[in-house]
C-alpha cells in the first residue's frame, strides 16, 4: 500500500467560527494553529496546506492568566535606529484586540511561504459580527 500524499487539488477546506469570549489566549491559539495547519485531518501532509479557514469573534474578550495583562509586552521595530516600540497587553487589547490573537497564532505556524499561506486563512474580529456568513461556518467549541 502506498503512502497517501495530499495535493492542493484534493484538499477540502471547511470554515469554522470560534468564540474567544472568556477563553485563555494560549489555549485558543494552539487549537487555531493546529486547525490552520490541518494536523487534525487524516490526510495531513507537512508540505501541503491542508488546513481549514478559521473565523475568530469576540477577540476583545480573550483573557490571559496571572499578571500577564499588565506584564506581557509586545515589541515592534520600525527598522530605523532607536525605532523599537513596546505596548502592554492591556493597551493592545483596548487599541487593536485582533492583533493579540494574530500574533499568538502566527508564532505557532511555520516560518516561510507555506506558513504565510496558512496565516491568511485566519480571520479575526474584535466584536461578535463577521462578514463570512455566505461561507456557512460551523461553530467550533474550544
From Swiss-Prot:
A GO biological-process term: negative regulation of translation
Any one of the GO CC terms: cytosolic large ribosomal subunit
InterPro entries: Ribosomal_uL13 (IPR005822), Ribosomal_uL13_bac-type (IPR005823), Ribosomal_uL13_CS (IPR023563), Ribosomal_uL13_sf (IPR036899)
Highest taxon listed in the record's lineage: Bacteria
Stated role: This protein is one of the early assembly proteins of the 50S ribosomal subunit, although it is not seen to bind rRNA by itself. It is important during the early stages of 50S assembly.
Family membership noted in the UniProt record: Belongs to the universal ribosomal protein uL13 family.
Quaternary structure and partners: Part of the 50S ribosomal subunit.
Protein name: Large ribosomal subunit protein uL13
Amino acid at each position: 500500500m502506498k503512502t497517501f500524499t495530499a495535493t492542493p487539488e484534493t484538499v477540502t477546506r471547511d470554515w469554522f467560527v470560534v468564540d474567544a469570549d472568556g477563553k485563555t489566549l494560549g489555549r485558543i491559539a494552539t487549537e487555531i494553529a493546529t486547525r490552520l495547519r490541518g494536523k487534525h485531518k487524516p490526510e495531513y501532509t507537512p508540505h501541503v496546506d491542508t488546513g481549514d479557514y478559521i473565523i475568530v469573534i469576540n477577540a476583545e474578550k480573550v483573557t490571559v492568566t496571572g499578571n500577564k495583562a499588565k506584564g506581557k509586552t509586545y515589541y515592534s521595530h520600525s527598522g530605523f535606529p532607536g525605532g523599537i516600540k513596546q505596548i502592554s497587553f492591556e493597551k493592545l487589547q483596548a487599541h487593536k484586540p485582533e492583533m493579540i490573537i494574530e500574533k499568538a497564532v502566527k508564532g505557532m505556524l511555520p516560518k516561510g511561504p507555506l506558513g504565510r499561506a496558512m496565516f491568511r486563512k485566519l480571520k479575526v474580529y474584535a466584536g461578535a459580527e463577521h462578514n463570512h456568513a455566505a461561507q456557512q461556518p460551523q461553530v467550533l467549541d474550544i
